[in-house]
């Protein structure tokens, strides 16, 4: 998985050289943000169920037809609601992984690849997940640098879906 740190090391190593001052400064910047990123990841983990439940409810409120349409991709039955919560949880989990590594690698490798095809195959609307992620972003309860770090990856996921 690519991160700014592993990319800098791979670049320097492929050229048979030590890390440059610029690369070291970039790596240092990541370490300075790491505490806030880990704080955000821990908070999102600890509040995951509340955030997922609230995000699913936000989707049902904004798109009430998803609770009225029959079929496995809609939330008219408990199994559909469980799938919706599972999918929202997947986006939230990828966000915490990105926070831990300090880069979008987890989303790029595990989420983005095939996302459009999955949504099309299962008739899933990206707008549902955008609403869910906006809800999480607006209610995660983080502040300061921890909020900035979390919002960076939530915004990244929202932009992927847009």
Swiss-Prot record:
Q: Which residues bind (2R,3E)-phycocyanobilin?
A: 84
Report how it sits in the membrane.
Peripheral membrane protein
A GO BP term, please?
A: photosynthesis
**Presence of keyword Nucleotide-binding:** no
Query: Where is the protein situated, by its record's location annotation?
Result: Plastid, Chloroplast thylakoid membrane
Q: Which UniProt keywords apply?
A: Antenna complex, Bile pigment, Chloroplast, Chromophore, Electron transport, Membrane, Photosynthesis, Phycobilisome, Plastid, Thylakoid, Transport
What do the Gene Ontology cellular component annotations say?
chloroplast thylakoid membrane; phycobilisome
Q: Which domain of life is it from?
A: Eukaryota
Disulfide bond entries? none
The primary location reported for this protein is plastid
Query: Which Pfam families would you find in this protein's record?
Result: Phycobilisome (PF00502)
Keyword field contains Cell wall biogenesis/degradation: no
Functional note: Light-harvesting photosynthetic bile pigment-protein from the phycobiliprotein complex (phycobilisome, PBS). Phycocyanin is the major phycobiliprotein in the PBS rod.
Subunit info here reads: Heterodimer of an alpha and a beta subunit, which further assembles into trimers and the trimers into hexamers. The basic functional unit of phycobiliproteins is a ring-shaped hexamer formed from two back-to-back trimers contacting via the alpha chain subunits. The trimers are composed of alpha/beta subunit heterodimers arranged around a three-fold axis of symmetry. The phycoerythrins also contain a gamma subunit which is located in the center of the hexamer.
Entry similarity comment = Belongs to the phycobiliprotein family.
Q: What is the official name of this protein in its record?
A: C-phycocyanin alpha subunit
């Amino acid at each position: 998985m690519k991160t700014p740190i592993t990319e800098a090391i791979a670049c320097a190593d492929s050229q048979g050289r030590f890390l440059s001052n610029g690369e070291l400064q970039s790596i240092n910047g990541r370490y300075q943000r790491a505490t806030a990123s880990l704080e955000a990841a821990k908070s999102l983990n600890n509040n995951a169920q509340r955030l997922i439940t609230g995000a699913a409810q936000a989707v049902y409120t904004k798109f009430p037809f998803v609770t009225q349409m029959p079929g496995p991709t809609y939330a008219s039955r408990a199994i559909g609601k469980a799938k919706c919560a599972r999918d929202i949880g997947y986006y939230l989990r990828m966000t915490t992984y990105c926070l831990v590594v300090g880069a979008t690698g987890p989303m790029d490798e595990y989420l983005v690849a095939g996302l459009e095809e999955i949504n099309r195959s299962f008739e899933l609307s990206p707008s549902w997940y955008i609403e869910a992620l906006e809800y999480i972003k607006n209610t995660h309860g983080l502040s300061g640098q921890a909020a900035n770090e979390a919002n960076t990856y939530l915004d990244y996921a929202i932009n992927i879906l847009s």
